[in-house]
From Swiss-Prot, chains A, B:
Entry's Gene Ontology cellular component terms: mitochondrial matrix
Primary location recorded for the protein, binned into one broad class: mitochondrion
Known catalytic reactions: N(2)-acetyl-L-ornithine + L-glutamate = N-acetyl-L-glutamate + L-ornithine; L-glutamate + acetyl-CoA = N-acetyl-L-glutamate + CoA + H(+)
Enzyme class: transferase
Assigned protein family: Belongs to the ArgJ family.
Keywords: Acyltransferase, Amino-acid biosynthesis, Arginine biosynthesis, Autocatalytic cleavage, Mitochondrion, Multifunctional enzyme, Transferase
Species, as recorded: Malassezia globosa (strain ATCC MYA-4612 / CBS 7966)
Gene3D superfamilies: arginine biosynthesis bifunctional protein suprefamily (3.30.2330.10), ArgJ beta chain, C-terminal domain (3.10.20.340), L-amino peptidase D-ALA esterase/amidase (3.60.70.12)
SUPFAM superfamilies for this protein: DmpA/ArgJ-like
Protein name: Arginine biosynthesis bifunctional protein ArgJ, mitochondrial
Binding site for substrate: T222, K248, T267, E364
């Protein structure tokens, strides 16, 4: 089977990266079919989007159209995926705050707003290759055309519709959403995608098998070097609940057209589908919190996309553990089932963090995975701002690439962070700052933490230990502000994840 | 003479950079002695600071101490410079807003605050090689020790003091300031610097010759590839006024010790000395405005240093044009001499802009000089925030390096700029944005502007023209927001200057 052709090497976090296998070999894991959520079917195919679109140019080089055609004997990577819930699912979403929102983002946010707290969706259509961004009114119409077509195909009036579909009074016309990633400023090749939709929505094509999920994850990929998919399973009350997460990392979509005319674009897309019975409003709050400490805490190059979207679906199809007792309520809400919701929120958060790390690990040119933990700040927002400033500093990222325990650059970037206001005002106290490099968990060398700055005073550094610590692929930086101007009242912390800046990044991003 | 050994090639801005001479050959210009301000003397020498300091390590490699010793036949670059005014000069300063301010920054800001609006200085002592940052109370004491020593040497009670010195009742004990740049977290080698001071302050060593000024500019350099010095001369009323500016660009100070232990650091230092008669308070306002639109509008790598300092001195020694009419007031102030002050402010601003550009051109690994002009925003601060966001985007900087007219990345980075609030609120309107690449001034190819986005709609791009425009060393990006949500009321503009991101940057910053 395709997904088994990746060797799962049992990646050891503390092995020096230079000796490791490819990222695909290390980070693609076999999916246990029993951990996939119930009531979802997926399909994906190759629509030829990259070849269909041309950048807006006045000259067309003859070779441009054929550049991305794969070798005849090589199956092209799928670029369209459909995820269908057998019943209308509760839906939640978080979207880019970029002013220039792509058409699918505008469509989804408008649809969710119109649908209100009981919003339901039946399907998520995703394409890679074209972001449908900066495409104006035409872009919105293109998204709507495709969404309408999927809705019609999944409608119970369509005699070919998937048999498990159940009519639900709550479902509305907003029940298909779309996500796009790829080249911006170019119209979506609607005809190319449209002619795949009947195939994608056919009952014989929609599958619940791990192969189908992995292929869907591949359809999301742009310059990602591996498909990103993980599952979680847990017992909640009398239900065995599962979540599957797919995401894709920041990546250049048009590697052969990087010169003028090719509009490269990086986007974060993610979808989390669960069979837990959660209301839309509750799911939204769980997702907000999960994204706040996962996807909103990663950085590859500091550039926020026009298309960033994370969607979560909950269809309530989780099986009962004790079949004699099936009187679980239809949907859990925070007020009525706080324990269930809290446990679900923790599981979703944990999965979001794991999935966000995969994006950092697959960051363009990334050779290091760096965790920046800022402790004992005034507020979470202040700790987050400082961790973000450190994690996006080009100088820090170059130092990590060079395996240099450079506390000076860390301190400097912490010092110019733009701090959100708080009452009372909170400030960093230079004489209280500790910067320590921590050994990665489970490292075999039994290294001790390496303090480089204690109470604002530079420390004598054991060069041998520093060299060893920084040679790991995973670097853990601990910044303890000891409460700053609030003293013992300053106890907030935030964790950020970033990668290093390598020459490879410049090459990829030319 | 040393400064004439650089060929001044009459740099043509539109020549493709690949065919150009070195940056030193292109950007070091001969100084006309008659354009230097009156009443200033300078000296510089090699104190061996880089060799004197050792990073805080537990192991000392034998080779470390000798790494930076120059070839015996090669004169070492000076690393200490003294600029002395023959009379106490009005003083103004702008300093880094980084929380972790270096000792000389704390010393200077404290001294200027204590001295009040009539602050006067006699001398500026500058060293490169050691930033005296993150050195705590000891660092402050070290700065004070050196400042005290220079004061004693320049005191009229010292019989060797320079003969032109005139006692001034207004001068106070705060009349020597210091600037430092280099390695951080390491104590200043006070003894090494101190033993040079008598030499530096000796009347036979202090000079007003262009050679002496150029050597002082060299003393400021860290990884700068050329000394940065320019002059301005202009008639104000009955006075022929001059300004000389020296600055140094962001640079790694310890290229041989970039691995753990070496704490690399980038700093912007600048000094502007004029013989115009300007009061300290007025000089401060002129400097604030000049820095706001020059040094605060450049970016090399987006990292703000702990040592950034710009100082301005005005000693009132400008010669009279008409010697029969010498009744000019002692000092010009904004309220009493607005025309004089406005003209002076324009000259200072123009010089600051020129000097700030030299830093961008000498940016580490920089091969392109990029001007980002944002027009028709709500407020200056909003235009500045958008221009800054575009100029610090790694993706935009990579695109400029790759000579890619990538309006998508420009738009995207404009879209996530963190906008300062205004009343009423102002927002970007995606349907009004124009992005145009402009031909550099005086380019011989007579190229037309290249609109890539008009009213938010991507334009067909003439590939040949785009290729030509982007092949220039200087790239001009014009972003017209057409007033955004304020319509015709949105008329503010800001200009930012940045460089590209090259593989060379990663190499330098390892």
């Amino acid at each position: 089977m395709w997904y088994r052709t990746f060797r799962t090497l049992g990646y050891t976090i503390c092995r020096p990266y230079a000796t490791c296998a490819t990222k695909a070999e290390r980070f693609v894991k076999t999916i246990d079919p029993s951990t996939l959520p119930r009531g979802y079917l997926v399909s994906s195919t190759y629509a030829g989007i990259k070849n269909a679109i041309r950048p807006v140019t006045s000259t067309n080089e003859p070779s441009a159209a054929t550049t991305n055609v794969p070798h005849p004997q090589e199956a092209p990577k799928p670029d369209v995926a459909l995820i269908v819930s057998s019943v209308p699912a509760a839906i939640a979403g978080t979207f880019t705050t970029n002013v220039f929102k792509a058409a699918p983002v505008v469509h989804a946010t408008t649809a969710l707003k119109a649908a209100g707290p009981n919003a339901r969706v039946r399907a998520i259509l995703t394409n890679s290759g074209c972001a449908n961004a900066v495409t104006g009114q035409q872009g919105l119409e293109d998204t709507q055309t495709l969404v309408n077509r999927v809705q019609a195909l999944l409608s119970p009036r369509n005699q070919n519709a998937i048999p498990t579909y159940e009519q639900d009074a709550r479902s509305s016309s907003t029940d298909v959403l779309m996500m796009s990633t790829g080249v911006i400023g170019v119209r979506l090749p609607v005809a190319h995608i449209q002619r795949c939709l009947e195939h994608l929505a056919a009952p014989s094509i929609l599958q619940s098998h791990p192969d189908a999920w992995l292929e869907a994850a591949r359809a999301y990929m742009t310059t990602d070097t591996f498909p990103k998919i993980r599952t979680r399973q847990f017992i909640l009350g009398n239900r065995r609940c599962s979540i599957v997460g797919i995401d894709k990392g920041a990546g250049m979509i048009h590697p052969r057209m990087t010169r003028s005319g090719g509009q490269l674009h990086a986007t974060l897309l993610g979808v989390f589908a669960t069979d837990a019975p959660i209301s839309s409003a509750t799911l939204q709050r769980c997702l907000d919190e999960a994204v706040r400490v996962s996807f909103n805490c990663i950085s590859v190059d500091g550039d926020m996309s026009t298309n960033d979207t994370i969607l979560a679906l909950a269809n309530g199809q989780a099986p009962f553990v004790d079949l004699d007792c099936t009187d679980t309520p239809n949907e859990w809400t925070e007020t009525e089932h706080p324990d269930m919701v809290n446990k679900f929120a923790e599981e979703l958060k944990s999965l979001c963090i794991e999935m966000s790390h995969l994006i950092v690990r697959d960051g363009e040119g990334a050779e290091k995975f760096v965790q920046v933990h800022v402790r004992n700040a005034g507020t979470y927002e202040q700790a987050h701002a400082i961790a973000s400033s450190i994690s996006t500093s080009a100088l820090v990222k170059c130092a990590m690439h060079g395996e240099d325990a450079n506390w000076g650059r860390i301190l400097c970037s912490a010092g110019y962070a733009s701090l959100p206001a708080s009452t009372p005002a909170w400030t960093l106290d230079p004489s209280k700052v500790n910067v320590t490099f921590l050994p990665p968990p489970h490292q075999p060398d039994d290294l001790a933490p390496l303090p480089t700055l204690v109470n604002g005073v530079p420390q004598a550094v054991n060069e041998t230990q520093a060299k060893k610590l920084l040679s790991y692929e995973d670097i853990y930086v601990d910044v303890d502000l000891q409460g700053g101007s609030w003293g013992s009242q300053g106890r907030s912390e935030a964790t950020y994840w970033t990668c290093d800046f390598s020459k490879e990044y410049i090459t990829v991003r030319w």
